[in-house]
């Protein structure tokens, strides 16, 4: 009896997670209503932290920009024009990773040919958790890779030991994008 209950609960959780994955959308237009709170941002970043990382190095870092003045400054000075509109009415999360840790030995020797690629990979895993948790809490996101990293570093006092990767806009959606077409799974997988 208990085994059956646990089995059904596990299946329900998995179904809810699958639905979350399938229903999440990239949001490029945000409502001025319902700004995200500091507590909600902390909840989202805690979820990001749960992602696996190389030797549990946990090198992802997050710089949350919530004041309207700072969002406007970052948008105008650090994002290309095409991304500035995507930041309107949103808060911003600048994502970085501490370089020369993930994929490296303690003495600084790379573990393999990817080197700092592992830090970026690990941050991608964290950012996936971040956008899924945001969606679960009712917030949309868009990950923007086009940004001026040096200017972000200057404005937000990001240390030179970190690599600036992306700016994530986060807020209440003002649009409902259709589900984009996905390739057939048979087209992207090979079995041997």
Question: Which positions does each model-derived feature cover?
Answer:
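Alpha-helix/helix-capping structural signal
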Residues: 25, 69, 147-150
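Small-aliphatic-rich amphipathic alpha-helix that forms the alpha element of a beta-alpha
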Residues: 48-49, 94, 100, 111-155
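C-terminal helix-cap and adjacent tail motif
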Residues: 19-27, 32-35, 166-192
């Amino acid at each position: 009896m208990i085994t059956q209950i646990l089995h059904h609960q596990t299946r329900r959780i998995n179904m809810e997670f699958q639905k979350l994955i399938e229903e999440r959308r990239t949001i490029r237009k945000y409502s001025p209503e319902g700004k995200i709170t500091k507590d909600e941002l902390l909840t989202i970043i805690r979820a990001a932290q749960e992602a696996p990382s190389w030797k549990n190095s946990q090198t992802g870092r997050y710089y949350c920009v919530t004041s309207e003045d700072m969002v406007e400054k970052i948008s105008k000075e650090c994002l290309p024009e095409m991304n500035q509109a995507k930041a309107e009415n949103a808060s911003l999360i600048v994502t970085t990773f501490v370089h020369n840790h993930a994929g490296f030995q303690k003495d600084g020797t790379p573990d393999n040919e990817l080197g700092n690629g592992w830090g970026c990979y690990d941050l991608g895993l964290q950012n996936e958790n971040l956008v899924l948790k945001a969606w679960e809490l009712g917030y949309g996101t868009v990950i923007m890779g086009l940004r001026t990293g040096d200017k972000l570093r200057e404005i937000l006092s990001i240390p030179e030991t970190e690599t600036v990767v992306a700016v994530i806009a986060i807020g209440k959606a003002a649009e409902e994008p259709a589900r984009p077409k996905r390739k057939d799974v048979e087209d992207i997988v090979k079995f041997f």
